[in-house]
């Protein structure tokens, strides 16, 4: 079998296609979670804490040179070391929500798989049972 034929069989198998679909859906789903965190959850958390914009929460680790604005972007461009923890908080909340949703999805999939495996086996048909009895009877006579 040639390499191209092997690759074709590999690429057409369900697992590769399932993986590709999963990656595409995951990328789109990640954008939804980013929006939920950035647009819905973090503003509520910010309103409770008193700061609405977490991206500008930081601590300057060294003195700021004169004439440099004290915004995070300006300090980073000037090479001033800053401990930018606000963006980390947003990313951590984003990760926690995404991980929880994936956990719920995997839990549901596993529950459905268990339900499929436990299907009761049906008893053989009456004519099959009769044929088996005849077969067993013939074996005993022989």
Curated annotation (Swiss-Prot):
The chain crosses the membrane at residues 10-30, 86-106. Keywords: Cell inner membrane, Cell membrane, Ion channel, Ion transport, Membrane, Transmembrane, Transmembrane helix, Transport. Its main location: membrane. One of its GO terms (molecular function) is mechanosensitive monoatomic ion channel activity. Pfam families: MscL (PF01741). InterPro entries: Mechanosensitive_channel_CS, MS_channel, MSC/AndL, MscL_channel. The keyword Membrane applies. It is found in: Cell inner membrane. PROSITE patterns: MSCL. One of its GO terms (cellular component) is plasma membrane. It is a multi-pass membrane protein. SUPFAM superfamilies: Gated mechanosensitive channel (SSF81330). Channel that opens in response to stretch forces in the membrane lipid bilayer. May participate in the regulation of osmotic pressure changes within the cell. Homopentamer. Belongs to the MscL family. PANTHER family: LARGE-CONDUCTANCE MECHANOSENSITIVE CHANNEL (PTHR30266:SF2), MECHANOSENSITIVE CHANNEL MSCL (PTHR30266). This is Large-conductance mechanosensitive channel.
């Amino acid at each position: 079998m040639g390499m191209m034929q092997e690759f074709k069989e590999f690429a057409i198998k369900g697992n590769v296609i399932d993986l590709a679909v999963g990656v595409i859906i995951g990328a789109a789903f990640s954008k939804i979670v980013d929006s939920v965190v950035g647009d819905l959850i973090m503003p509520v958390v910010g309103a409770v804490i008193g700061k609405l914009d977490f991206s500008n929460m930081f601590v300057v680790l060294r003195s700021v040179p004169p004439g440099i604005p004290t915004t995070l972007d300006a300090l980073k461009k000037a090479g001033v070391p800053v401990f930018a923890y606000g963006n980390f908080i947003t990313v951590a909340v984003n990760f926690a929500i995404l991980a929880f949703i994936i956990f719920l999805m995997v839990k549901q999939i596993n529950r459905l798989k268990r339900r499929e495996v436990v299907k009761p086996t049906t008893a053989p048909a009456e004519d099959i049972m009769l044929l088996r009895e005849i077969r067993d009877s013939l074996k005993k006579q022989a």
